[in-house]
Amino acid sequence: MLLLSAVKTLLLAWLGIVLVFMSIIKSAMLDFLQEAGKLEGIETYKKEAQTSFMAPSWALGHLMGRK
């Protein structure tokens, strides 16, 4: 009987650890996806600026965000 309760306890502990790691991985993946979306927006802005202003690409990267 003691062995059965020990197995149940270990199983529940293992499931708890798996759930914790899954939540950590999920939150990290969401952060990476948000950063990728920001980078995609910057690349789109660079392409639009280069075609509309005929600016060289090195100037867009260097001067971006300065006022």
UniProtKB/Swiss-Prot annotation:
One of its GO terms (cellular component) is extracellular region. The modification Pyrrolidone carboxylic acid is found at Q50. Its main location: secreted. GO terms for biological process: defense response; neuropeptide signaling pathway. The modification Methionine amide is found at M64. Residues 1-30 form the signal peptide. The keyword Signal applies. Residues 31-49 form a propeptide. PROSITE patterns: BOMBESIN. Keywords: Amidation, Amphibian defense peptide, Cleavage on pair of basic residues, Pyrrolidone carboxylic acid, Secreted, Signal. Expressed by the skin glands. Pfam families: Bombesin (PF02044). The keyword Signal applies. It comes from the Eukaryota. InterPro entries: Bombesin. It is found in: Secreted. Stimulates smooth muscle contraction in isolated rat stomach strip. Belongs to the bombesin/neuromedin-B/ranatensin family. This is Bombesin. It comes from Rana shuchinae.
